[in-house]
Amino acid sequence: MRTVPLFAACLLLTLMAQAEPLPRAADHSDTKMKGDREDHVAVISFWEEESTSLEDAGAGAGRRCICTTRTCRFPYRRLGTCIFQNRVYTFCC
C-alpha cells in the first residue's frame, strides 16, 4: 500500500518538471517585463563530414552555430531562424 502514494508523488513531480511556467499577469508594465526577460540561447555544433542542407546554407561542418533572441555578434552571421517551443530565434553561424 505504500507504493501507490510513492508512485503518485513521483508522477506528480514528473508532471511538474515538464510543465511550462504560467504566463505573467497583464498588470505588469512593459518596461518591467523587458527588464525581467532573459535571453534564451541554444548552442548547436555541427561536426558532420558529409554535406548537409545546413552546410549548403553556409553552416560548414565543424562550425559552431547558435540560436539567440538577440542579433548575431562577431564572428557569427545570420543564416536564418530557429523555432523552439513556439518561439522564433535568430540562427547565427
Curated annotation (Swiss-Prot):
Keyword Lyase: no
GO BP terms, alphabetized: antibacterial humoral response; antimicrobial humoral immune response mediated by antimicrobial peptide; cellular response to lipopolysaccharide; defense response to fungus; defense response to Gram-negative bacterium; defense response to Gram-positive bacterium; defense response to virus; disruption of plasma membrane integrity in another organism
Propeptide: 20-62
Coiled-coil ranges from the UniProt annotation: none
Pfam families on file: Defensin_1 (PF00323), Defensin_propep (PF00879)
Subcellular location: Secreted
Disulfides per UniProt: 65-93, 67-82, 72-92
Gene Ontology terms: cellular component: extracellular matrix; extracellular space
Keywords annotated in UniProt: Antibiotic, Antimicrobial, Antiviral defense, Defensin, Disulfide bond, Fungicide, Secreted, Signal
InterPro entries linked: Alpha-defensin, Alpha-defensin_C, Alpha-defensin_N, Beta/alpha-defensin_C
Residues annotated as signal peptide: 1-19
Protein family according to the UniProt entry: Belongs to the alpha-defensin family.
Role played: Has antibiotic, anti-fungi and antiviral activity.
Protein name as catalogued: Neutrophil cationic peptide 1 type A
